[in-house]
């Protein structure tokens, strides 16, 4: 696919590390060529926003070898693992290849994806649960500094706990990082917080898409109050080992509620803001909103920023991500897909007994 460098179902980690596509990517980046795999970062940078590429080039500068070439030693300081699509939520910005729970009403909306040429896998994906996978990770462990877990929902994936157990002997030198809905901190016999305490640090990107009513609407099956309680437990148990942020996925559903969401993250969750963008499918992209709603949101964002003094790092992050989202919102006119967004939203509301307008009344004249 457009952003796949290798598949460890067909090769080992080590083979993928210096595979043909990986070599070409390194060669392009070292030569200043914009490789197509990195299109999201290039697009954000062209809009004047700070991309993940730019941010990591600063925060992880100490991990970059002095001598880089297209073939590199098999030493991986940062490893991100997406091992399955097991998940207990049906987030509107998601789909079955990333959430098994989405299968409940997928048949009602899959034609919307197919209409834009997107076909999704709809099977439970647990193909990496084998001895070779664990052996490869243990082989890498001595040079690892950060292991990142995503999903699916990693905290309900048994393989995730298997990996944690394998890494525990190296835990004093490894930090673990998560993209998680934090709906569970215990899973079967596994005590997540107890395991985390054996590692150097724990970095959590909370998957949360708004203040409680908005988050619970977008992320079907979510209970934001449970998330807040679990977050308090994690912070209390881990102390200085913990760091985290609220990683809102900016979509057409939460454009209007962004200021209230950031206010909740800052003052209730006591957590710095972060952000991702729902680039696709195109019909949930924030850019599908009509001009009038974009103007309303833009005015709301500017008014909110006037109340947030950029005098500390957390407030500076609010300014950064509000401006990034505002720039993205207004960068393109994709309003030709707005009717599809409304239709898709209506179908899910009927299937899930929810009401978008009840949560975001600014859309009442459009539905």
Predicted regions, residues:
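Recognition helices and adjacent regulatory flanks at domain boundaries
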Residues: 46-77, 87-89, 128
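Core AdoMet radical
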Residues: 76-86, 97-129, 142-158, 170-188, ...
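Membrane-interface junctions of multi-pass transporters
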Residues: 2-43
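Distinct, well-ordered alpha-helical segments
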Residues: 159-165, 187-195, 257-261
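Eukaryote-biased activation of long, low-complexity terminal tails and linkers
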Residues: 116-131, 140, 145-147, 169, ...
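Leucine-rich repeat
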Residues: 134-140, 164-169, 193-197
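Conserved C-terminal portion of the radical SAM core fold
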Residues: 175-177, 198-205, 224-366
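Local cysteine-cluster metal-coordination motifs and their immediate loop/turn environment
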Residues: 34-46, 86-96
């Amino acid at each position: 696919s457009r952003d796949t460098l290798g598949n460890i179902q067909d090769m080992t980690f080590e083979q993928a590390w210096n595979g043909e596509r990986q070599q070409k990517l390194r060669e392009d980046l070292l030569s200043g060529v914009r490789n197509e795999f990195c299109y999201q970062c290039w697009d954000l940078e062209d809009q004047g926003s700070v991309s993940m590429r730019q941010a990591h080039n600063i925060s992880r500068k100490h991990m970059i070898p002095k001598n880089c070439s297209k073939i590199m030693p098999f030493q991986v300081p940062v490893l991100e693992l997406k091992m399955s699509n097991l998940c207990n939520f049906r987030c509107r910005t998601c789909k079955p290849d990333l959430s098994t729970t989405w299968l409940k009403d997928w048949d009602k909306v899959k034609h919307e994806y197919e209409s834009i040429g997107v076909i999704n896998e709809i099977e439970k994906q647990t193909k990496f649960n084998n001895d070779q996978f664990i052996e490869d990770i243990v082989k890498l462990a001595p040079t690892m500094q950060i292991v990142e877990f995503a999903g699916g929902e990693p905290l309900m994936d048994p393989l995730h706990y298997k990996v944690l157990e394998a890494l525990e002997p190296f835990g004093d030198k490894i930090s673990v990082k998560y993209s998680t809905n934090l709906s569970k901190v215990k899973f079967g016999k596994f005590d997540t917080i107890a395991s985390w305490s054996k590692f150097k640090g724990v970095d959590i990107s909370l998957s949360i898409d708004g203040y409680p009513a908005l988050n619970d609407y977008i992320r079907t099956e979510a209970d934001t109050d449970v998330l807040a309680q679990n977050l308090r437990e994690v912070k209390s148990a881990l102390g200085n080992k913990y760091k985290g942020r609220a990683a809102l996925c900016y979509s057409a559903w939460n454009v209007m509620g962004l200021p209230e969401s950031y206010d909740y993250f800052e003052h209730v969750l006591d957590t710095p803001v972060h952000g991702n963008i729902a680039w696709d499918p195109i019909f949930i992209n924030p850019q599908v909103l009509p001009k009038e709603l974009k103007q309303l949101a833009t005015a709301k964002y500017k008014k909110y920023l006037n109340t947030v003094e950029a005098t500390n790092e957390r407030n500076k992050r609010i300014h950064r991500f509000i401006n990034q989202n505002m720039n993205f919102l207004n960068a393109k006119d994709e309003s030709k897909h707005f009717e599809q967004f409304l239709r898709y939203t209506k179908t899910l509301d009927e299937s899930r007994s929810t009401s978008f307008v009840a949560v975001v009344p600014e859309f009442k004249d459009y539905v």
